[in-house]
Structures are given as C-alpha cells and as structure tokens.
C-alpha cells in the first residue's frame, strides 16, 4: 500500500525514532508499504518517519555504482532495522541532496565519502556493510531521519539557507493539512 508522506513541518520528522524490539508481520508490511511508497515517488531511499512511523527503520534501493557513476538499482529494497553508523571516512565530499519530505528542493551537502553500517534485516539477522559514494550518502541521509535530522540542517552556505526559508515555509503551509493534529508545527 502506498502510504501518505510526512512533509516538512511535521514534528515526526524531528523526533528520534524508536528502536524496533522484534520483527513482526506489521514490520514486514511496513517495509512493503515503504518500498511501494518509495517507488511511487521515485525515491532511492525512505525512512519510517517519512511515512508517519517513528521507528528505527529505513529502506534503500541502490546496490552501488558502476565505474561510470551510473546507479545500480535493486529489485527489492535493502532493509536496515535499528541501524548504527560507524567509521566515517575523514574525506568529505559535496553532493546534491533532495528529500521526498521536502519536495522540489535540492542543496549541496558535505558528507563522508564512505561509512560502515550495522543493522538487522527482515530475517532478524545482524549484518555489517561498508558503503562508498552515493549509496553511502543515501545511508547517511536516511539514518539522519531516524534522529530527527533533515539534510537542510547540514547546509553550510548562508545564501542557500536564506534562499530555502521561503520555500520551506511554502512546503509547510501546502502540506500542513496532511500533518496529524498532534504533529503540527507551531
């Protein structure tokens, strides 16, 4: 089922997500729904808070990059439950980021070139993988959602931040009707 997205202005996007104590049928259904929602909105990753669930879970549908820099997409998303990031590379690279919860806007963000993630999959098995380039950027972006952080919080250019203020307010107003009453920004 395609779920309704949470947009800038929703408090759930600013909360620390809850750890998932066990994988249930509801968890599996949430992953399926997140995958369908991500595909419907042409995303490459999606975190549970973006579909209104304050749970430590995200999905990603990029396996890697070719030597030419083209993305290699997967048939079903990789699932990261209760992820923990470690070993960020010291070298930072700038990359353009967008977010399904902040439609129509993109900005340059500095992030480590590589990262290690340890998480649990849908079978309850812990795994660790090391990612580089764009897949690493997706992991860091989605993991930020689990800590109430949006990519706009990482923007460094004052001119970009100033430029975004009016656009963010328009997004907040436009999608405010979709925000649950308890999650309305003041």
UniProtKB/Swiss-Prot annotation:
Superkingdom of the source species: Bacteria
Residues forming the catalytic site: 142
Matching CDD domains: Pep_deformylase
Top EC category: hydrolase
Cofactor(s) needed for function: Fe(2+)
Keywords recorded for this protein, A-Z: Hydrolase, Iron, Metal-binding, Protein biosynthesis
GO BP field: co-translational protein modification; translation
EC nos: 3.5.1.88
Cofactor binding notes: Binds 1 Fe(2+) ion.
Sequence positions that bind Fe cation: 99, 141, 145
Stored Pfam families: Pep_deformylase
Catalytic activity: N-terminal N-formyl-L-methionyl-[peptide] + H2O = N-terminal L-methionyl-[peptide] + formate
Gene Ontology molecular function terms on file: metal ion binding; peptide deformylase activity
Described purpose of this protein according to its UniProt entry: Removes the formyl group from the N-terminal Met of newly synthesized proteins. Requires at least a dipeptide for an efficient rate of reaction. N-terminal L-methionine is a prerequisite for activity but the enzyme has broad specificity at other positions.
Family (UniProt): Belongs to the polypeptide deformylase family.
PANTHER family in the record: PEPTIDE DEFORMYLASE
Protein name: Peptide deformylase
Native source species: Chlamydia caviae (strain ATCC VR-813 / DSM 19441 / 03DC25 / GPIC)
Gene name, Swiss-Prot/TrEMBL: def
């Amino acid at each position: 089922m395609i779920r309704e997205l949470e947009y800038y202005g929703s408090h759930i996007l600013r909360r620390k997500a809850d750890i998932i104590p066990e994988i249930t049928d509801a968890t599996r259904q949430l992953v399926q729904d997140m995958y369908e929602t991500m595909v419907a909105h042409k995303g490459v990753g999606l975190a549970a808070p973006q579909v209104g669930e304050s749970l430590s879970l995200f999905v990603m549908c990029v396996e890697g990059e070719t030597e030419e820099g083209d993305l290699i997409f997967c048939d079903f998303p990789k699932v990261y439950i209760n992820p923990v990031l470690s070993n960020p590379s010291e070298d930072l690279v700038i990359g353009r980021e967008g977010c399904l919860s902040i439609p129509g806007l993109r900005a340059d963000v500095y992030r480590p070139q590589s990262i290690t993630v340890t998480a649990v999959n849908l079978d309850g098995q812990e795994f660790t993988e090391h990612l580089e380039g764009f897949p690493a950027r997706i992991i860091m972006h989605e993991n930020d959602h689990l800590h109430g952080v949006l990519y706009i919080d990482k923007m460094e250019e004052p001119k970009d931040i100033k430029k975004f203020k009016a656009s963010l307010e328009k997004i907040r107003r436009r999608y405010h009707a979709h925000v649950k009453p308890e999650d309305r920004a003041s």
